[in-house]
Amino acid sequence: MTLDERYDRTRKFVYRQRRRLPAVFVAAGSVALLFSTPFMICDGPVFGALCLACSCAGFWVRWRALAQTAYRRSRMKADPAAFAEPFSVEGIHSRVRYPLHAGGFLVWLGPILFTGVGWFMVSASLAYALCVWLAMSGEEALRLEKYGEPYRAWCDATPAVIPDFGKPGRPAPGRLRAAALRCDATVFWSAAAAFVWLGALKFRMVDLSWHIPAVWMIAGGGVILALIFSVLLRPSR
């Protein structure tokens, strides 16, 4: 197998497994916390708020993209010729090709940083960025096979993840915000569960006690129930 063939196989494998990657990094962060030195763990309300803000920014990007995609799909079901292009090029997609991947990176960067373990924060952030890049590359290869030269021309004109605000964008024809919230509910509650779990572990390591405050227990139970219901009620793609 040539290096190009191995790279192609790797990126397509990472793309297929992309939804499992956050669980791997959260599990690795849990292990890093359990084997860390308590006084070396970054903690505090300001640090936690910054990590939450990172994840919230990622959700904002994802929800914008999902709202536009949901509207596009509903229009195309009613009228297959409603759009000239077979793939999204309007709204947020006119400035960045992969807003879902970019948003997803920010969403899960929050829990990675929230571990507060210095070496893990750096290494896991870089490793997750590499995984997201491979997933985007794998998706791009599949779309090039499907759409051909029109998609390649769009790739040449549109950045992958860092928006070009100097480039004139195309307004989104519409958005279905409620549909976007339903589509991303499982990701939202999964990220919330990761924050609660890592927060409980940090309390154990910093305070050297398993007597976790009741508020963490209540929050954890509520998040787990919400996650279960979001999985059961998840709309089919």
Can you say where each PLM-predicted feature lies in the sequence?
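Membrane-anchoring alpha-helices and their flanking helix-loop junctions
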Residues: 1-93, 105-237
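Histidine-centered phosphotransfer motif of kinases
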Residues: 96-99
